[in-house]
Amino acid sequence: GKTLRIIMPVLNVAFVGSESLAKKIAKKGDVRDIESYVYKEERNGEIGIISLLRPLKHPEKIRPLLSVLNVAKVGIIEISKVDSALGEICVSFGCAKIEKGLVIINSQVGDWVDPEQVRIILEQSGLKNWELFEQLPDEHSIREKLFSFMDNLEREVSSLILPVDQFFNVKGVGLVAIGYVQSGTVSKHDTIQVLPADENGIVRSLQVMDDDVDTAISGDRVGLAIRNLREEALHRGCMVVHANSNVLNKNLSSTLSIIKAPFQKRVLQIGDVIHAAV
């Protein structure tokens, strides 16, 4: 059925932890490389939405984690043991400049996690302002903390940026592009521009979590049915923006300054191949 959406405040939370804790906090949505959990509550006369984005396959794959960090404003890290994967997670959040978050120690039977050791890791990885829970709080307390973060974040009025991670042709629908809305909103009948191909199309319809919607908002994983666009214009990693928004500039070459991350042992050498999440 058709779902009418009023633009509501949404808090995107990068969640690294167990499926069981995520399910307590919010309702599970679609699953690919990233699980999504959504919780809605009316507060002060408007609906607030908490959207947990839980990357899968870490530490084997870093890409889902980086995709989540690109759209998240705050974070939750659930700790069952201290290992190198935890260090990588904390450094990733620190490098992504996610300054607000909750760290929850939830050690399993027989595995004790030292809160002081965790505090040191947080301090060293740039997460010293995160709140540490030495034992698992109830889900209501976690939600209240997240809503307080939402209340303190400035409401952004930002332009549409939607990186595409897959696309295909659907019989009877046509060309469909799928990705997370990194910022802004996109609506039915909008004229969109695909970069770097620099070709325009029109949004025929949108689906979020298998519902037809009129508008998709920041943090949504959306399927965009597009007409008047060549399939060749799309590729994995291409960007969808509003036509004539000039929100992205084309650069043929860029100069980067690299800040050394905490715990980084290697120094970059000429000829090294690096993977960048921008």
PLM feature segments, named:
Residues T3-G45:
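Conserved G1/Walker A P-loop phosphate-binding module
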Residues Y37-E46, S51, L69-A72:
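Switch- and interface-adjacent substructures of P-loop NTPase systems
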Residues N44-K61, I77-S80:
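Switch II (G3) loop of P-loop NTPases
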Residues I47, K265-R266:
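Short Lys/Arg-enriched alpha/beta "domain-start" segment
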Residues I62-N129:
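Conserved C-terminal guanine-recognition region of P-loop GTPase G domains, centered on the G4
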Residues S125, N129-A233, M239-A243, V247-K260:
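Conserved catalytic-core segments of large NTP-driven translation/proteostasis enzymes
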Residues H189-T191, G271-H275:
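Exposed beta-strand and adjacent loop surfaces of beta-rich binding modules
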